[in-house]
Every structure is written in C-alpha cells, then in structure tokens.
Amino acid sequence: MSVLFYTISFILDFILGDPYSWPHPIKVIGNFIQLLTNALRKIFHGKSLYFAGGLLFILTVGMTGIVSWLILYISAKIAFWLYAAVFIYLGYTTLAMTCLAKEARKIQRTLADGDLEAARVQVGMIVGRDTDKLTAEQISKATIETVAENTADGVIAPLFYLFIGGPVLALMYKAVNTLDSMVGYKNEKYRAIGFVSAKMDDLANFIPARLSWFFLVIASFILKYDGRTAWRIGLRDRKNHTSPNCAYPEGAVAGALGITLGGTHEYFGETVVKPTIGSGTKAVTQKEISQTIHLLYTASIIAFLIFISIHLILF
C-alpha cells in the first residue's frame, strides 16, 4: 500500500508543484527555526552559540519527527482514508520538483523579456548570493546551479528518505535541509549557531548527492546530451565546492551541457572565492536553463522508478 501512496505523492508534485496558498509543513518548520533561533540568541552569546546551534538542530529535527509521527498516528486511529490522505500529502510536501522548475522558468521568461532588474530579484529568491549586480549570463548560471543542486536536496534526497522511512523521515530530512538554508552560512552572523546544522546537512546529503550525479548522468544519455562528459566532470570536479556534495550534481549538469559553473560570488557583501565546475567555454543562455529543467525532470523520474523498484524487491 505504501508504494501506491509514494506514487500518488510523486504524481501530485509532478502535476501541482507547491501552490503558495496551500498549508505547507516546510513553512511551519521555517517559522519554528526563526523563532527558536531568535530565542536562543537572547540566551547564548559568543562561543556558546555553537552549543545553541546544537540545541537548535536537535529541537527542530526532533520536533519535526515527533509531530509528523503523531499526526500520522492520530489520523490512523480516526480512519484509514484519513491516514492515507495525510501520508500522501506529507510525502508530497517534501518534494520540490515542479516548484523548482516553475521558479527557473519564471527567471527564464523574465530574461527573455529583457528585464534584467526583475530577473535579479527573482533569482535572489532562490539563491543565497548577492544578485543586484549580476549579468544576464550570471543569472542564467545561478539559476542552473540552483536547479542542479536542488535536484539533489529538493527531489532525490527527499525521495531517498521517503522510501526508507516514509513521510516522517522525509520531513526530518527537510528540517535538516531547511536549517542549513536558514542558518548554515559561514559568515560572522551564522558561523557559530549554524555550524551543527551545516555539518549535519552535509551528512544527510552525502549519499543522495552522489546518487543525483548518477541519475543526472543517465538522464543526460536519455536526453542525448553529453552523458560521458557529465560522468567525467561530476567525478573530476567533485571537490570544487565549499560543500562536499554540491559539486556532484552541478558537475553532472555542467558536463552534460558543455558549460562552466561555480566560481567566485558575493554573499552578504563578502567575496567568496570558489573554483569553477566544468570546462565548457560556450556562453550560458536561457536555452541551458531549459535543458537543466529537462535534466531535473528526467533524473527525478529515473530516481523514483529505481527507488520504487528496490522497495518492491525488498519489501
């Protein structure tokens, strides 16, 4: 029965994405993180913020697991149909495939209209770097990098944990990922309180990131992109990122499309020097955004089919 629930969750994400007006657990988790972070900052200062960051991680992930388990448990006690609906909905909310594609297409359309200022604002909604001075090509690159990275932590990783431990484990993973996106920065403000969250996010994404590289390589062959180079660049440039995971999917996409990603960016006014990923020399345009979206969908479907096949064999 769980296989049917997983399938419906995946199809719902494929069709609907994440409508902004719908209630969403990740929004609740984000609000909880913000409130708890503010409270902990009033109590802890200096180096003790490292300890506070540990509390932040344990309380956020722990509460996410407990609350989601209780919701499923109570719904099961009331009626099976309610349990099924809650299971499917919670699983669906952990996936970000179509939402990610929609955001990328918005930026693509704005660039096509020649509205650079609006495109800078839009890309600033999905990346952590400063975007107010980006060129059209830099905006395209930032969009592609985000889609590539989030193919791993927005789709493949939630699917991975969903098939292992159902919506509870998938939501706990999303809590880890949300913590990293909110406090896992290396600047002065977040270095201490976000240290534990950043390290745990690296750990949680260790396997999914490498699986994402593999699925993106397969997708590259299916779409008749450069699959061999996707394989090679993903391995060659796997360490060309401050994260131990991000270069795997970004390298696969860069190799598949024959482009170069990464490099130096500004974050909160500070210049962060990063190595490049890929060795392509062609200019990056809106066309490559479309190709990256195709890779996102194809790799996600491949991952789902492989995970569901393994689940059927084992269970």
Swiss-Prot record:
What cellular component terms from Gene Ontology apply here?
plasma membrane
Keyword set includes Transmembrane helix: yes
User: Any idea where this protein resides?
Assistant: Cell membrane
Q: Which residues cross the membrane?
A: 54-74, 78-98, 152-172, 203-223, 295-315
Q: Which InterPro entries match?
A: Cobalamin_biosynth_CobD/CbiB
State the Gene Ontology BP annotations: cobalamin biosynthetic process
The record, for Pfam families, names:
CobD_Cbib
Q: Which UniProt keywords apply?
A: Cell membrane, Cobalamin biosynthesis, Membrane, Transmembrane, Transmembrane helix
Q: In which pathway does it act?
A: Cofactor biosynthesis; adenosylcobalamin biosynthesis
- Where does the protein principally reside? membrane
Q: Name one GO molecular function term.
A: ABC-type vitamin B12 transporter activity
Report membrane topology.
Multi-pass membrane protein
What function does this protein fulfil?
Converts cobyric acid to cobinamide by the addition of aminopropanol on the F carboxylic group.
Question: HAMAP family, from UniProt?
Answer: CobD_CbiB
Give the UniProt family note: Belongs to the CobD/CbiB family.
Q: What is this protein called?
A: Cobalamin biosynthesis protein CobD
Organism (species) = Listeria innocua serovar 6a (strain ATCC BAA-680 / CLIP 11262)
